[in-house]
Amino acid sequence: MTNREMKSRVMTLGNRLTARGQNRSAAFVRAWVIVKQGGLELAVKGVTFGNRQEALRRLATYDPSQVRAVLVPEPSNPADTEAVAVMVGVQNGRGLFCLGYVPRNMAAVVKAMGGKLPALRVVSGAWGRPNYGARVALAV
């Protein structure tokens, strides 16, 4: 990425974050960090709720190229009107399943980054923990 392209992406993301109500200075610092890193990787929250652990266990058996993730804003969510759900599905599957949510403090950033499809990574329990987790990566 050239210096000019990088500046353009920082300006675009920074202005989108500012439009979503973030402090202008903080928005541009956050945009610069995200663009320099080449994107953003976030842990999906709420993966231990309901039958989501069973869904993650099953997703872990698929090749990553067969799994697709979609980020869906949920303005009618009673707990958080800014919530962004992480919906997943498999190739030739029966629709999408809500795997969890983007962390509350990053929802505005994810919305500002636009409708890019994220990459999903299922991670198994670490340090002896039996639970599965998931991470989504968004490229700039």
Segments predicted by a language model, with ranges:
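Short intrinsically disordered terminal tails
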Residues: 1-3, 139-140
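Conserved active-site motif detector
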Residues: 9-20, 25, 29-140
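IQ-motif-like calmodulin-binding regions
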Residues: 4, 8
